[in-house]
């Protein structure tokens, strides 16, 4: 399912960062004159712009590119020297890194190209040597890895716990992982047993006990037993967060509750999941934010907008990146 850039960013970085940081300690990447650094939620510069690229912090370290990828700590000190062609966020004490193949992106779980992935610890030492064609983040003690054209799962020692056999695989979420087998998606448990048999055209990770699945060209939701709880009727869906999930119907996005009832009517051109009580929505070509009642608390005015991480949300205006607070006021102005 095609998603906007903010969906990918939110899923792959914000959640991991928020699991280990408080709003008081989160640092935000900014770009000045083509160089990247970090600011606090107040807009105060903490790490001067000096990197080719910088990503969000997770578990106290952030991937940064200085020709090649390495990691810095919250003081800006290089904790792991730049040496990788790709570097993923830390999750559960390990980070997937790639040697060979190049590429500017810090994390590409389904990327293509040469090189091999392995996993390092916060000291930069390999815990799992580079050997995989592709690799995802650890979740629930397991990570999806690709070998010989198929996906399986390893534990934190690098031991294969579910043999590579799948055409595609996502990270574990709520003890189940979406996998693709023989052209259809289902869900496996940590033992490798199919908890929900492959039967769907597409499948999303579980969130709050429900997962979006597509069948017959329409999206609905199933519970962990595989029972359909919300009939397939939507053109697209996102994940449930605090009882609300974005869905698209008849060309517009709104939000439903776990019974499938619309809480916020379908009226937006695009919409993302809630975070910190607000959700990005696009209307008339611009992005703003709504609260759980559907009220526009920050009027549509941005070219792009991401979900809130702590107290701030990253937005783009006039081609420049900035950060706003929950009132919509710029803390880091895109003009900088």
Where are these regions (language model features)?
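Bacterial N-terminal signal peptides
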Residues: 9-17
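Residue-level detector of conserved, function-critical positions
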Residues: 21-336
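Bacterial N-terminal signal peptides that target proteins for export
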Residues: 1-9
């Amino acid at each position: 399912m095609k998603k906007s850039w903010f969906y990918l960013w939110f899923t792959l970085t914000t959640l991991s960062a928020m699991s280990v940081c408080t709003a008081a300690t989160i640092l935000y990447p900014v770009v000045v004159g083509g160089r990247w650094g970090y600011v606090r939620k107040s807009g105060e510069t903490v790490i001067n712009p000096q990197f080719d690229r910088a990503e969000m912090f997770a578990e106290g370290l952030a991937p940064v590119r200085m020709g090649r990828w390495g990691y810095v700590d919250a003081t800006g000190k290089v904790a792991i020297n730049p040496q990788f062609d790709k570097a993923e966020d830390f999750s559960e004490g390990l980070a997937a890194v790639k040697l060979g193949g190049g590429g500017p992106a810090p994390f590409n779980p389904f990327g293509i190209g040469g090189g091999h992935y392995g996993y390092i610890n916060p000291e930069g030492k390999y815990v799992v040597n580079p050997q995989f064609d592709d690799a995802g983040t650890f979740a629930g003690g397991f990570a999806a890895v690709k070998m010989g054209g198929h996906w399986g799962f390893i534990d934190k020692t690098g031991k294969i716990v579910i043999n590579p056999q799948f055409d595609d695989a996502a990270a574990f979420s709520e003890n189940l992982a979406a996998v693709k087998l023989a052209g259809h998606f289902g869900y496996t448990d940590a033992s490798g047993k199919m908890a929900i048999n492959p039967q769907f055209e597409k499948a999303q990770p579980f969130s709050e006990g429900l997962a979006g699945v597509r069948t017959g060209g329409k999206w609905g939701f199933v519970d962990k037993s595989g029972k359909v709880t919300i009939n397939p009727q939507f053109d697209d869906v996102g994940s449930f967060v605090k009882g609300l999930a974005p869905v698209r119907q008849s060309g517009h996005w709104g939000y439903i509750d776990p019974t499938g009832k619309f809480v916020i009517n379908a009226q937006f051109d695009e919409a993302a999941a809630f975070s910190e009580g607000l959700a990005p929505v696009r209307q008339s070509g611009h992005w703003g934010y709504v609260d759980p009642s559907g009220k526009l608390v920050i009027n549509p005015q941005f070219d792009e907008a991401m979900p809130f991480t702590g107290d701030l949300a990253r937005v783009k205006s006039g081609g420049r990146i900035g950060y706003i607070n929950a009132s919509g006021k710029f803390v880091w102005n895109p003009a900088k």
